């Protein structure tokens, strides 16, 4: 269920950017907050804030730029990677991996020497 929420939020960000909007409303979850924190570090979004809207929490995201986001793992097709294969990946700057600690970039996974499920890449 968490995977569907994250994929839905990423697709919402891409669609709102492609339609020319700077603000996107996303579904609130703790892992979505981790994802948005990583996207701020990568300078893809400017900022985000949480508001209570009709007794439900929503995340309002201000988008800066989205170059290209490619989803690897889907609910029906999960792709895992071990620690020893992380160094062989060519586009190691924008790969986001879901681990037992949470969502991490590939550089953080190399420092901690852990693998996980490949979630998406930012190209």
From Swiss-Prot:
One of its GO terms (molecular function) is structural constituent of ribosome. Pfam families: Ribosomal_S8. InterPro entries: Ribosomal_uS8 (IPR000630), Ribosomal_uS8_sf (IPR035987). Transmembrane segments: none annotated. SUPFAM superfamilies: Ribosomal protein S8. It comes from the Bacteria. GO terms for biological process: translation. Keywords: Ribonucleoprotein, Ribosomal protein, RNA-binding, rRNA-binding. The keyword Ribosomal protein applies. The keyword Cell wall biogenesis/degradation does not apply. GO terms for cellular component: ribonucleoprotein complex; ribosome. One of the primary rRNA binding proteins, it binds directly to 16S rRNA central domain where it helps coordinate assembly of the platform of the 30S subunit. Belongs to the universal ribosomal protein uS8 family. Part of the 30S ribosomal subunit. Contacts proteins S5 and S12. This is Small ribosomal subunit protein uS8. The gene is rpsH.
